[in-house]
Amino acid sequence: MRHRNAGYKLGRNTSHRRALLRNLVTSILMEDRVETTITKAKAARPHVEKLITLGKKGDVHSRRQALAYLQTREAVTRLFDTVAPRYGDRNGGYLRIVRSGFQRGDGAEKAFIELLGAEQELDEKRQKRAEARAKRREEMQKAMAEQQQAEGGEPEGGNE
């Protein structure tokens, strides 16, 4: 029985679990949306919520506390300048966990953990990627057309 066994051990020792959660939390704050297993998402949620609450305070002490937990200075800057102001009027509940199927290798349940209100930024990223992809495709087609035209203009057996 699991009476009074709070928290998630994730099949790791203490330092490995702490490193995993720090990496996951940093990735969530930098990317707005991360796919992971459902258990890791549930384990990371309270850490992200606490950091966003620190970001809403915005004082130097809070910034230093966040810097002690997060992996990069860029993540701290993004937390305090971009993510935390998004939730100025909200008291908690900054994340959403959406189940997304099962992992192929071991059948673990996968989920997206995402920051609420990040849909616009995610859509902009997706749109930029689609535009870049279309531009690359257009350049490739142009290069292929030029290559075919150059090949078609030369007489056969020109190497002899």
UniProtKB/Swiss-Prot annotation:
Its encoding gene is what?
rplQ
**Any Pfam family the entry gives:** Ribosomal_L17
Record key words, sorted: Ribonucleoprotein, Ribosomal protein
Does the keyword section mention Membrane? no
> Which PANTHER family does the UniProt entry name for this protein?
LARGE RIBOSOMAL SUBUNIT PROTEIN BL17M, RIBOSOMAL PROTEIN L17
Would the keyword DNA damage turn up in this protein's UniProt record?
no
**Region ranges (Disordered):** 123-160
> What GO molecular function annotations does the UniProt record carry, in alphabetical order?
structural constituent of ribosome
Composition-biased stretches (Low complexity): 142-152
How does this chain assemble? Answer: Part of the 50S ribosomal subunit. Contacts protein L32.
Q: Which domain of life is it from?
A: Bacteria
**GO cellular component term of the entry, any:** cytosolic large ribosomal subunit
A GO BP term here is:
translation
Under what name is this protein listed?
Large ribosomal subunit protein bL17
What InterPro entries does the annotation carry?
Answer: Ribosomal_bL17, Ribosomal_bL17_sf
Q: Which family does it belong to?
A: Belongs to the bacterial ribosomal protein bL17 family.
NCBIfam families per the UniProt record, alphabetical: L17
Query: Where are the compositionally biased (Basic and acidic residues) regions?
Result: 123-141
